């Protein structure tokens, strides 16, 4: 499902023209719910974040107790290695959940690992530019715990992404689907926020400035928090459309989602020196989500103005929507589902714009304002679900 990669800079808006092909049937306020079959589908950007197996120089019964415990820890972390590719996303979540508990309780039992003695635990990072994942060492147990928690949060994002795609393939999210997708995204946001504010800042001093995984930077955790909240807000936008909510409410919801992704993009652009490059899917995905939600907001705003017979404002809002669609035309080509949604959105915008222009030429004769009335105030209806570390039960291989 992945298109061919190309060099892409999210800081520059592409100038691709959108299609203005006339639709086969009327697309307006009364038909929006019936004809809108697509939405921005979130993806798990850390789709392959995995722990690498710890290699031991020799096997033998004479290993110290610490190394026996390290082997037991390695067995627990190895179960996470194939979580990203597992057919059942919930299985991967349970594996990471188990490992987060295990690594938390291991503190104090594996002092050698914290002192940098013995084998090094490494992780394959997938949030960098380039085709191959780069391997990074975990700086002690605290770093290992941070990697594991990032992986667990990514599992919740994977659950959100897979359920969203599955339900949309069946025709829509529905109440239960919207609630479930939103909850997983909000749980992920809470974990990323916990990493950003609590786990990662104390690690900064112990990290090698030229050899730091993107997953161990507070700025990347902030980006992922905002993206996850944007995905949760996107589920609310879709459900509002399915329910036939008023155009003004849909405009406010889409504006809220757009601003969350806009803020994520701002962090990506301003904190570039924190990272060893950023994967193109991440930069492109944030731009596509930001601009398509902005276009949806202006389109809903245009529908509301059309209902009030403000044809000039309708045309102005459609022009703003067209600008937003153009801004992400190139980026949308990175994923097939994004390109499909982008084309469908462009068609809806062009159809309403053509309808409004014709009505204005024949009936209303209104002046077209520039830039037109502003969008209604954003309505952000989601927030992160606070992550509270659990008290792990004591396992026998860390006893004695």
Q: What function would you assign to each model-found segment?
A:
Residues 198-210, 267-281:
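Short, solvent-exposed, charged loop/turn and helix-capping segments
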Residues 144, 151, 158, 221, ...:
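"A position-specific structural signal for the A-helix of alpha-solenoid helical repeats
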Residues 127-132, 137-138, 157-195, 200-213, ...:
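Short coil/linker segments at helix-helix boundaries
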